[in-house]
Amino acid sequence: MRGTAGVPDQPVPTPTPSVPTSSSPVPKPPTQGNKKWCVPKAEATDAQLQSNIDYVCSQSGMDCGPIQANGACFNPNTVRAHASYAMNSWYQSKGRNDFDCDFSGTGAITSSDPSNGSCSFLS
């Protein structure tokens, strides 16, 4: 009902802006001492892992020298070992965001250092 002069009797509510809730996904920044690495999932096939190696090693700024013959991470000379190095290098260089370890569902985050022998993985 309107009062005199066409003014509403009750105040008109104003819309409030939508505010993201705490359930919105927000990547957590890496913290000192909280080291993580990206490695292949156990069920990833050699073909999928070779595709990951090919992709990472074709990108500008990525150094795949360590997984080439005579490189510090060439041995063990397996697709899985080479993919571990390449996938982790990508993950670390892109800021350690979990989504940078997806690799079409073939990557997994671990807190166990995959380095071995003379091969040191970035962390």
UniProtKB/Swiss-Prot annotation:
Disulfide bonds: 38-101
Organism: Olea europaea
Compartment list: Cytoplasmic vesicle
InterPro entries per UniProt: X8, X8_dom_prot
Signal peptide feature range: 1-21
Protein's UniProt name: Major pollen allergen Ole e 10
PTM per Swiss-Prot/TrEMBL: The N-terminus is blocked. Phosphorylated at Ser-24 when expressed as a recombinant protein in a heterologous system.
Lineage: Eukaryota, Viridiplantae, Streptophyta, Embryophyta, Tracheophyta
Tissue distribution: Expressed in mature and germinating pollen.
One Pfam family cited in the UniProt record for this chain: X8
